[in-house]
Curated annotation (Swiss-Prot):
Keywords, sorted A to Z: Electron transport, Membrane, Mitochondrion, NAD, Respiratory chain, Translocase, Transmembrane, Transmembrane helix, Transport, Ubiquinone
Bilayer topology annotation: Multi-pass membrane protein
Name of the protein in question: NADH-ubiquinone oxidoreductase chain 4
Biological processes per GO annotation: ATP synthesis coupled electron transport
InterPro entries, per database record: NADH_UbQ_OxRdtase (IPR003918), ND/Mrp_TM (IPR001750)
Amino acid sequence: MFAVYLVFSFKKPEASKADLDFFMLTFKYILKGSFFLMLVLALFCALFTFDLMFSAKNLLYPNEYIWDSGDFFFYKNGALKFSLNLYGLILVFLCLLTGFVAISTVDNLYSEDKLKFYLIFFQFFLAVLGFIKCSDLIAFFFFYEVLMLGSVLVVFFGSYSKKSIHAVIYFVAWTQLGSLFVLLACLYIYSLTNSTNFFVIKTFVFSKTQAMTIYSLLFVGFGIKFPIWPLHYWLTKTHVEASTGFSIYLSGFLVKTALFGFYRLTNLIQVELDTTFFLAVLVAGVIDSSLNMWSQTDLKKLVAYCTIQEMNLIAIFFLKGDSSLIAYGFLFTIMHALMSTLMFFLVECIYSRYKSRSTLVVNGVFFSFNNLALAIIFMVLFFSGILGTLKFVCEFFVFNLTLHVSWPIGVIFVVVVSAIGLIGFSKNWFNAIFCAPSKDVGPDALDLSKKELYIIFLCFAGLIFLTFLPFLMI
């Protein structure tokens, strides 16, 4: 079934017009629907298989440790045991969603190039399953590095300029620097506990000095990929030079793996720590990215700074360790993935029509493409965090937390994020929408296609659903 799907999906430009026959189109849609159902079924089978591979933890240790690992669903029937991590399930969902949208942006490639993207995505998916299910430091670090390998291949094969090579070098250098700090933290944990098993490590009593050392190494190591201030400039460069498909996957999924790694490993340290300094770094990252939105003329770079701002906001939820805040952190993670996917996809829609991402060139979208302009307006409304959206609820908790730590810093933080950053973000998009057209887009330029409308609708449907989800949690 998968082979037949590839045959009908990978068409070269010189394909015959017979493919437009109604029967052929119907058959193709049936194949794609069947492939999607098989993919969902394979997801649950793979999760069950990976759980059996790592089930030794459930057989060798008491059942109460399963709940300590963050699993939200547990089934036991004799020797058969099944558990699943909540954040891990979110990562799998984001992997599939962002992968689907990212691959949909490369329709103009030949079959051989498309096949590379599918194979890399399959490698991503296997690495994600191992990453969320393993309970060993060595395996955890191994799968974390395997995720980076696929990222390099996507950037390398998805961009065809010399600057893309520089982006690959930037990406590899900075992520490997972060991995070095994570590796040092893992080695230090092993030297103290003489074990790489998560459940043994969690029962070990760390001193405050040891815990702070481990926490600092993990914060810097994973924080480079969040990214934290001032180690985030590699991300904007990579976004600008890489393909839109990779930008969607990087912002919607890959940065979440670093946050998951930080959350899971720091949960092994059962010591109360003063995290004021780390909170200050995250606040500085939010303020810096908010101010940088004012000076951007490249829409893709503007979205990259939005990613930095929101990822630092999400990290604040996990920094405090409060269960209620972490629950909203999970929701904020999904919301950011949908929002960043939507924003990067809208940038791709603009680029395909104007052949530019610069706000100096892209003007008058509303006068030429009404549906595209309407989608951008609703995107800005969801990003603004107006009353009734999930972002409003999440930002309320973050602002309340910063105000409790320091009133002066909290007030500055609220003003910069809610006013200065939002205005800087909105003005660039509204200039592109409502300014008088300065470039003829040509008579062949069309409004949003059915595929583009479907992807945009999918993102908005997810954002609307998440808007009502907090009321179900009360």
